[in-house]
Amino acid sequence: MKLAAIHHVAIIVSNYEKARDFYVNKLGFAVVRENFRKERNDWKLDLSVGDGADAIELEIFAEPNPPERVNRPEACGLRHLAFRVDDVEATVAELAQMGIECEPIRLDSYTKKKMTFFFDPDGLPLELHE
């Protein structure tokens, strides 16, 4: 068996409007599909980032009253999402202008590249990595 690539990552959010604003208007994801699922009384938002073979989809499910993360970030399951950027420092500055705080920039001990973390509106850790 040979897997070609990761097609998408799915996350559950507690507030659809906040999550949509954060991922689309602040992080620059493109909306692929947006559907209200009447039978479940929730929203499913499919987003995309990257181009061509580097594109990946993020599926957002807005569930009513989801349980909070057990702890951060060390829990079974998804630990964090990491985004490749050309310039961590410039990206951190852009996020700061939008009121989004990042941890101090540090050097990844394995890749020797600059990296940092910040959090989405539900506290999901997000990484920036050069």
Show where each model-derived region lies.
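N-terminal beta-strand motif that seeds the catalytic metal site of vicinal oxygen chelate
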Residues: 1-18, 78-81
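Vicinal oxygen chelate
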Residues: 1-2, 46, 92-130
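Exposed loop/turn and edge beta-strand positions of beta-sandwich/beta-sheet ligand-binding modules
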Residues: 5, 41-43, 77, 112
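Short hydrophobic/aromatic beta-strand micro-patches
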Residues: 10-12, 48, 82-84, 129
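Core segments of cupin and vicinal oxygen chelate
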Residues: 12-55, 97
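A short, acidic/glycine-rich surface segment
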Residues: 32-33, 42-43, 65-71, 104
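Mid-chain, well-packed structural core segment of small domains
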Residues: 71-77, 81-89
